[in-house]
């Protein structure tokens, strides 16, 4: 029986509580348990030695983790993945720092990883590769003669040609992507951008059932919006707040606004702070009656752009609080630290407004988690950016343009004063979508489609059989 082989930049924690794991890790773990398999990824360690893979077995799942050398980490992860692909795919060409040697290192690491994975893979195994760190991974596998079914899911947006054309290795990246059998995207706009970019550099034949032919390769390009575990989130949210937080919530009269993001320039945090400032300026009735909590733990702190955004937010938070605070009231709480996911779900449930306004986002699961954590009898209101993939599904949120500070301020005012009947109606429409398109559905849909695609070995076998008749 074929196994599922998952490859991602970081491997999931082998020992960990389900309530602290993200939805993606839980969904993939469940899929691995169903059919047995292997999870292959980086262990987060830097080592100059050629260390063997760290292997661990948990029931019918094997975890195989590799370390990286400093030069590999720098070129593959820090430089090309996170200072070229990440900013470009989030429409920030001004932050791209491209060097050919970094791209070469990126491809070299993908080839090295494919070489280390190959001995662990059986001929009939199905490979599921995740995210932008591994765009060329299938090409590296094919180079080694691997004919397995290989699927790829891009968790971040795929940019339009005006952006993608600025990347020097764009043709190479597109050709390498066509070595996958199935390429999955968060939204139809991402899928269309992929095909549009392909059509600019090679002949693309549009076939049936979302299949295309490019570079003499058949690839299926399809949309799979990622979901969450609504029932698990509800259970976490319904639990009591820790005593200190419960006491703090009791002391805080008025309404709470919550945002939770990684500290990243794609999340629109400075623009969000400015919109909140506009709310306090233009709607003075809310002063003293609301508090805004922005939780933004540091990520990629060794990249200069992330250091810059942290400094900017600290400055903005201090300026806004300095202008509006009183002895009894502080309007904005900026928390640059990590909180357990289980605690965040409880916090979401006690906040009247969820403010999720990225400038560009593949999906944004925080939006779905906020809705799933709400009390159906007294739900909060979600304010969501048009530019998040989640906006395609959560159409009953208050949808906003994150660049329009007046528009976001107006949406905040509307959310803070929305009657219960409207809050309930919007919540019911959104939670129905979230339950229908949950993480299990996402995993199952992708893997079912991948299994239906003939492997390269089957295609070769059919061709040989036909030629001998």
UniProtKB/Swiss-Prot annotation:
It catalyses: D-glucose 6-phosphate + UDP-alpha-D-glucose = alpha,alpha-trehalose 6-phosphate + UDP + H(+). One of its GO terms (molecular function) is alpha,alpha-trehalose-phosphate synthase (UDP-forming) activity. UDP-alpha-D-glucose binds at residues 22-23, 262, 267, 365-369. Keywords: Glycosyltransferase, Transferase. It comes from the Bacteria. The keyword Transferase applies. InterPro entries: Glyco_trans_20 (IPR001830), Trehalose_OtsA (IPR012766). SUPFAM superfamilies: UDP-Glycosyltransferase/glycogen phosphorylase. Pathway: Glycan biosynthesis; trehalose biosynthesis. Signal peptide: none annotated. One of its GO terms (biological process) is trehalose biosynthetic process. Probably involved in the osmoprotection via the biosynthesis of trehalose. Catalyzes the transfer of glucose from UDP-alpha-D-glucose (UDP-Glc) to D-glucose 6-phosphate (Glc-6-P) to form trehalose-6-phosphate. Acts with retention of the anomeric configuration of the UDP-sugar donor. Belongs to the glycosyltransferase 20 family. PANTHER family: BCDNA.GH08860, TREHALOSE-6-PHOSPHATE SYNTHASE. This is Trehalose-6-phosphate synthase. It comes from Sodalis glossinidius (strain morsitans). The lineage of its organism: Bacteria, Pseudomonadati, Pseudomonadota, Gammaproteobacteria, Enterobacterales.
């Amino acid at each position: 029986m074929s196994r599922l082989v998952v490859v991602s930049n970081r491997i999931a924690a082998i020992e960990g509580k389900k309530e602290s794991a993200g939805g993606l890790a839980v969904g993939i773990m469940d899929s691995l348990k169903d059919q047995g398999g292997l999870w292959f990824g980086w262990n987060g360690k830097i080592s100059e030695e050629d260390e063997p893979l760290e292997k661990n077995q948990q029931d019918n799942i094997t975890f195989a983790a590799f370390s990286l050398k400093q030069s590999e980490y720098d070129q593959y992860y820090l430089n090309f993945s996170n200072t070229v692909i990440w900013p470009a795919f989030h429409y920030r060409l001004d932050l791209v720092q491209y060097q050919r040697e970094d791209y070469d290192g990126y491809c070299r690491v993908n080839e090295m990883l494919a070489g280390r994975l190959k001995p662990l893979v059986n001929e009939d195994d199905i490979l599921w590769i995740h995210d932008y760190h591994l765009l060329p991974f299938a090409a590296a596998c094919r180079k080694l003669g691997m004919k397995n079914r290989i699927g790829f899911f891009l968790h971040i947006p795929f940019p339009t040609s005006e952006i993608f054309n600025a990347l020097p290795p764009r043709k190479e990246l597109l050709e390498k992507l066509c070595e996958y059998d199935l390429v999955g995207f968060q939204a139809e706009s991402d899928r269309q951008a992929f095909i549009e970019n392909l059509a600019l550099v090679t002949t693309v034949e549009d076939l049936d059932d979302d299949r295309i032919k490019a570079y003499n390769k058949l690839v299926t390009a399809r949309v799979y919006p990622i979901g969450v575990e609504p029932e698990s989130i509800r259970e976490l949210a319904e639990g009591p707040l820790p005593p200190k937080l419960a006491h703090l919530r009791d002391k805080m009269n008025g309404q709470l606004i919550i945002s939770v993001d990684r500290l990243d320039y794609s999340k629109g945090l400075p623009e969000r702070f400015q919109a909140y400032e506009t709310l306090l300026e233009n709607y003075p009735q809310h002063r003293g009656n609301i508090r805004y909590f922005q939780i933004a733990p540091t990520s990629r702190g060794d990249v200069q752009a992330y250091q810059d955004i942290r400094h900017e937010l600290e400055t903005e938070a201090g300026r806004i609080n300095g202008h509006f605070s009183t002895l009894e009231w502080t309007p904005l709480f900026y928390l640059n630290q990590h909180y357990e996911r289980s605690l965040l779900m409880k916090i979401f449930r006690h906040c009247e407004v969820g403010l999720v306004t990225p400038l560009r986002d593949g999906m944004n699961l925080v939006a779905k988690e906020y809705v799933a954590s709400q009390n159906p009898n007294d739900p909060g209101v979600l304010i969501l950016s048009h530019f998040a993939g989640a906006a395609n599904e959560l159409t009953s949120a208050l949808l906003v343009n994150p660049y329009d500070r007046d528009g976001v301020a107006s949406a905040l005012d509307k959310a803070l004063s929305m009657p219960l009947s409207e809050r309930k109606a919007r919540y019911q429409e959104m939670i129905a979508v979230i339950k229908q398109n949950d993480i299990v559905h996402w995993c199952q849909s992708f893997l079912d489609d991948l299994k239906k695609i003939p492997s390269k070995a089957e295609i070769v076998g059919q061709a040989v059989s036909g030629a001998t008749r």
